């Protein structure tokens, strides 16, 4: 960039009244504005300081601290000015305008640099916002599906627990029912044993009655035989008496009528036979009734026993099935608890990783914010420098306007004058300190 193409519009408007001096630097020499210059000291007029922070020094300031060799003639011209100088007022005015042009070049480059930094800052902020949005999107994945899965597993666990509790209650009820049936079975068994004992007692009584009947029948036979013997003896006695009395002997005796033993015995026999028959019928009826009742009770008890046995078998099957289901539910519960534990461990590890990522991103955001604050501070410093430079330029413009009003135009600055008369190289009093706030020191051989 040449010094002639960097003059601002305001400075061009202020310099239209006076022609520009012809020098080597203003005729196309590549004189770069050095942003690292602290301030420029002139022997006739002390210029205010132009300070820039050392952070934004371009590479040209670090590699080269002097102007090119083609600019040494102009620097010699400016360096020859002092007390007792033979240059005219027009030459001094041209040197001052050249200095203002150089300052304008520096200001233009500085403004360009400021715009570039503003663009870079805007791009950096946009990138930071995009990165923060993307990181927020990547840092906050959708856990709703996992939460729904966890809720479903919890609901299944609760349902399984309720089912287990219901099965435990059913098992307890089945055990109580089995205990009741067992008690009923034992009561029926005791009743059956009592009935069998009664039947055995009745059978013994029946045997006794049968023996009594046999004894009575034997007695009846013996009585019949005795009656037959008595009849026979009576007939023999009657025959013997008839033989003794004769055929026609009639004896009239006043005595009680004779007793008919046969009739009496027949009556006794009939009575005893009737009694025995009645007793036999009564005993047979009672025995038959008892046997029928016992048979009915035995049949009922056997049916109930079969029903109880079938119920006990069914209950045992149900208990076995419930125990198998309970074991299966226990194993399912254990597997679900293991799965839940593994899921909790996995999610806790994922949450720890996410927390680490969040911590890292927060640290990065803190660093980015610190960088932004630092850049904002530097930007504020640049804005302050810009404002100070604008104030200095306004001051220089006012000084130039005052000088233009006081001094005549330089006749050597016509377009026909292409070069200036060289002068011997005298050391310049232009000093450029490296740091802000350091005093001026003369540069050797007129170099920056």
From Swiss-Prot:
GO cellular component: cytoskeleton; cytosol; extracellular exosome; intermediate filament
SMART domains assigned: Filament
Segments of this protein annotated with the region Coil 2: 260-403
Chain positions of site Stutter: 345
Annotated IF rod domain residues: 96-407
Region of interest (Coil 1A), residue spans: 97-131
Spans annotated as Coil 1B: 143-243
Residue segments, region Linker 1: 132-142
GO MF term (any one): structural molecule activity
GO biological process: epidermis development; epithelial cell differentiation; intermediate filament organization
Tissues where the protein occurs: Restricted to the hair cuticle.
Miscellaneous comment: There are two types of hair/microfibrillar keratin, I (acidic) and II (neutral to basic).
Alphabetical list of PANTHER family matching this protein: INTERMEDIATE FILAMENT, KERATIN, TYPE I CUTICULAR HA2
Family stated for the protein in its record: Belongs to the intermediate filament family.
Record-given protein name: Keratin, type I cuticular Ha2
Lineage: Eukaryota, Metazoa, Chordata, Craniata, Vertebrata
